[in-house]
């Protein structure tokens, strides 16, 4: 089982592994990514994808309009060779600017030949090479089936986002795996509910590692209650994230949680 999973916390090693697997691909490369930067690393991936297209490999690419931009010029060489490139939720202006532009696709998923997948926190970017990230290389058939289905859902409905889109909300199950398809919601996010339930049932230890820690009322309540039950509770975060505003706001929550233990 363990040989089916490999964890990366170094982006350079991650990208080297991704590029190596893409180079060996025989059938398809699917990429769903928030930010595909037009920098040295982005060009390296684009160049390799172009080579694979010329070999007859299927390439599908879904990028987010906020993270990557809505202009497809950078991807034109791929499109000309037959790649399917889609932009998730192009930016809306006017009255819809604040109402809809927060609905982003922040996923980072790469699937190669339907046999290998990468999922985690890293974008395709040279900018984040020195960041501490967490990504997993997967060769588990059950989990790959879930990830393929999730990618197909996103790729098919890239311009039809809706709060009422049931397909975007469902949990995908396979064996012991549960994959929660979540998305920005002004009412409630299923992943938050899942976290709260897991924390409320914790008996010995809770470890949270995140760059942005802004827990809502319910999550703060469950964390404090866990400490009171004797659960060893640890939150790991950077002293300074790349979003200064978040660093300022989180001080309030850290004070409350620190006092609780």
Residue ranges with predicted function:
Residues 1-87, 92-261:
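Charged, low-complexity intrinsically disordered terminal segments
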């Amino acid at each position: 089982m363990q040989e089916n999973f490999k964890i990366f916390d170094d982006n350079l090693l991650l990208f080297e592994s991704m590029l190596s697997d893409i180079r060996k691909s025989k059938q398809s490369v699917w990429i769903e990514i928030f930010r595909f930067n037009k920098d040295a690393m982005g060009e390296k991936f684009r160049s390799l994808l172009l080579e694979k297209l010329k070999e007859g490999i299927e390439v599908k690419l879904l990028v987010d309009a906020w993270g990557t931009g809505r202009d497809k010029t950078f991807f034109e060489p791929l499109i000309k060779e037959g790649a399917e490139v889609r932009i998730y939720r192009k930016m809306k202006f006017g009255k819809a600017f604040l109402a809809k532009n927060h609905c982003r696709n922040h996923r980072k998923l790469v699937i190669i030949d339907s046999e290998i997948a990468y999922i985690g926190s890293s974008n395709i970017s040279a900018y984040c090479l020195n960041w501490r990230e967490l990504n997993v290389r997967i060769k588990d058939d059950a989990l790959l089936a879930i990830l393929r289905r999730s990618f197909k859902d996103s790729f098919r409905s890239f311009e039809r986002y809706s709060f009422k889109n049931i397909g975007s909300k469902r949990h995908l199950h396979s064996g012991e795996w549960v994959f929660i398809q979540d998305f920005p919601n002004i009412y409630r996010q299923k992943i938050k509910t899942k976290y709260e339930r897991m924390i409320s049932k914790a008996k010995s230890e809770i470890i949270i590692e995140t760059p942005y820690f802004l827990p809502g009322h319910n999550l703060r309540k469950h964390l404090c209650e866990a400490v009171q039950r004797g659960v060893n509770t640890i939150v790991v975060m950077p002293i300074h994230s790349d979003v200064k505003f978040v660093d300022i706001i989180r001080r309030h929550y850290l004070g409350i949680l620190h006092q609780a233990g």
